[in-house]
Amino acid sequence: MLIDWFTVIAQLINFLVLVWLLKHFLYRPILNTIDAREKRIADELADADSKIAEAEQQREAFQQKNAEFDQQRTAQMNKVGEEAKAERTRLLEEVRQESDALRSKLKLALKNEQLSLKDSLSQRAREEVFAIVRKALSDLASTSLEASMADVFVKRLDALADAEKTSLQATFQESTEVLIVHTAFDLPKKQITQITKALHGLLGDGVVIEFATDANLISGIEIDSHGQKIGWSIADYLTTLTKRVNDVMLSHNAVQDESPELEKSQEQAS
């Protein structure tokens, strides 16, 4: 059998042309369509992955924000709780301090009132005692007691220090008025002579001396000239005693007044 090479070549060319035509007009559009579809699917998958990733990021961001919000809320609640606790403690401390201050004031006021009442009663008692003593001495005063007081007065003049004598001389020697000797009762002549002699010996014989009675004196003697006075009497002793007792009571009260302040300072320090 003879091979028709022309026919074979023609068939081969036809086959190649057919393959090229199929590839160009049939397979290529199909392949392009498949590629386009694959590309579209890939793009959609990529877009879906992107959206999923974005959603995941948003979810994580939301969770982070929620966590931060929870932390902030917890911190804020803790802060508010601490502030409320501190404020409660401050208010309680303020109330306690006010209560302590009020208690101290009431205690001090009560103590002061007690001291005031005690001082008032003590003062009244002292006044009554001294008044009774003064009245008793006034009732007991007599001419004989006055004579004894005159003897004591003369002895006191003789016992004066030089500086005191000089002061009395400067006081009474310059006076041109009569020197008056006051007594509660009329003195016997002996005591008058005794006092006159003592005063002349101290002030000089030129001093004019007169004697007078003064009911306000309690067993004592007082010398008066030109507004200048010296004297010695039981009343003077009572006055001095009263002053000393009052000074002692004032000092005692001052110490008691300092005691509440000291107690208050010690309580605050503790």
From Swiss-Prot:
Alphabetical UniProt keywords: ATP synthesis, Cell inner membrane, Cell membrane, CF(0), Hydrogen ion transport, Ion transport, Membrane, Transmembrane, Transmembrane helix, Transport
Cell compartments where the protein resides: Cell inner membrane
Membrane topology: Single-pass membrane protein
Positions in coiled-coil regions: none
GO terms, molecular function: proton-transporting ATP synthase activity, rotational mechanism; proton-transporting ATPase activity, rotational mechanism
Xref: CDD domains: ATP-synt_Fo_b
A family per Pfam: ATP-synt_B
Keyword Transferase: no
Transmembrane segments: 2-22
Annotated GO CC locations: plasma membrane; proton-transporting ATP synthase complex
Function of the protein: F(1)F(0) ATP synthase produces ATP from ADP in the presence of a proton or sodium gradient. F-type ATPases consist of two structural domains, F(1) containing the extramembraneous catalytic core and F(0) containing the membrane proton channel, linked together by a central stalk and a peripheral stalk. During catalysis, ATP synthesis in the catalytic domain of F(1) is coupled via a rotary mechanism of the central stalk subunits to proton translocation.
Family membership: Belongs to the ATPase B chain family.
PANTHER family reported in the protein's UniProt record: ATP SYNTHASE SUBUNIT B', CHLOROPLASTIC
Assembly, per entry: F-type ATPases have 2 components, F(1) - the catalytic core - and F(0) - the membrane proton channel. F(1) has five subunits: alpha(3), beta(3), gamma(1), delta(1), epsilon(1). F(0) has three main subunits: a(1), b(2) and c(10-14). The alpha and beta chains form an alternating ring which encloses part of the gamma chain. F(1) is attached to F(0) by a central stalk formed by the gamma and epsilon chains, while a peripheral stalk is formed by the delta and b chains.
This protein's name: ATP synthase subunit b 1
Annotated source species: Marinomonas sp. (strain MWYL1)
Record gene name: atpF1
